[in-house]
């Protein structure tokens, strides 16, 4: 797996990108907490920022993030509920899901995180793309696998897919209780646990890799490396800030011009 690359814009906005997704033609970005002129780049939905960012400021930041993708593209999100639900853009406002698929180069599929795992997936052959939000509950429910199944239903082949895993809380910072340990054990993710004495810890990065591999992705089709939101000042951390923190966006745009005659049926 290749690590994500840090890109710094002329206004000093910092985002992370995947070399594999970029080489395949997918416009995408994982935001950080570092915005233009080093402002705190909170991409929470306007009016709902846990750190109290002014709604007008949130709106300006969202427009700035969208400019990373060129053109005048809307950012398409869902109401995230820690599930295995997958929506397809355009989704109705308030749609509850934890992944969103785009089928062309119009809207930006995006998810919000501040410790959970953001995953971006693209299929170069069909042009399909998806953004996925995966906390421990979503990994137990296998939202990565559900997203890959939904992409296959729309013509993607697993061997075509490229995935990039963004920053999330690391194993040293993610202390979990017995209920989480039991849930991960039952979901076949026991190898992603570091058990006590004392409290146990969970490795969300490795759990994500495990889910992607179980869904059929090869290791050399996955980009990313452990980047801990709780210990790296470039990122927001819900747990590290006791809830009063900003939100990242991870976004991706599909590739237009897909020929329907190339779409396979499953």
Question: Which role does the model predict for each range below?
Answer:
Residues 1-266:
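Active-site microenvironment for binding and transforming phosphate-containing groups
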């Amino acid at each position: 797996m290749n690590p994500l690359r840090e890109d710094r814009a002329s206004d000093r906005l910092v985002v992370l990108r995947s070399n594999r997704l970029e080489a395949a033609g997918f416009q995408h970005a994982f935001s950080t907490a570092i915005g233009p002129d080093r402002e705190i780049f909170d991409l929470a939905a306007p009016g709902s920022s846990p750190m109290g960012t002014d709604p007008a400021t949130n709106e300006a930041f969202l427009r700035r993030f969208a400019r990373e993708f060129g053109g005048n593209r809307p950012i398409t999100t869902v109401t995230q509920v820690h599930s295995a639900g997958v929506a397809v853009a355009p989704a109705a406002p308030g749609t509850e899901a934890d992944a969103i698929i785009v089928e062309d180069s119009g809207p930006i599929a995006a998810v919000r995180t501040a410790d959970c795992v953001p995953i971006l997936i693209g299929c170069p052959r069909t042009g399909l793309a998806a953004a996925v939000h995966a906390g421990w509950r979503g990994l137990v429910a296998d939202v990565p696998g559900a997203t890959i199944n939904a992409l296959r239903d729309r013509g993607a082949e697993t061997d075509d897919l490229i995935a990039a895993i963004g920053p999330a809380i690391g194993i040293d910072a993610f202390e979990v209780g017995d209920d989480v340990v039991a849930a991960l054990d039952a979901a076949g993710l026991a190898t992603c646990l570091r058990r006590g004495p004392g409290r146990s810890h969970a490795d969300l990065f490795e759990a994500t890799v495990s889910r992607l591999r179980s869904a059929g992705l090869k290791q050399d089709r996955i980009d990313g490396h452990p980047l801990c939101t709780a210990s790296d000042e470039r990122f927001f951390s819900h747990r590290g800030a006791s809830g009063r923190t900003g939100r990242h966006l991870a976004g991706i745009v599909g590739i237009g011009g897909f020929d329907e005659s190339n779409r396979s049926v499953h």
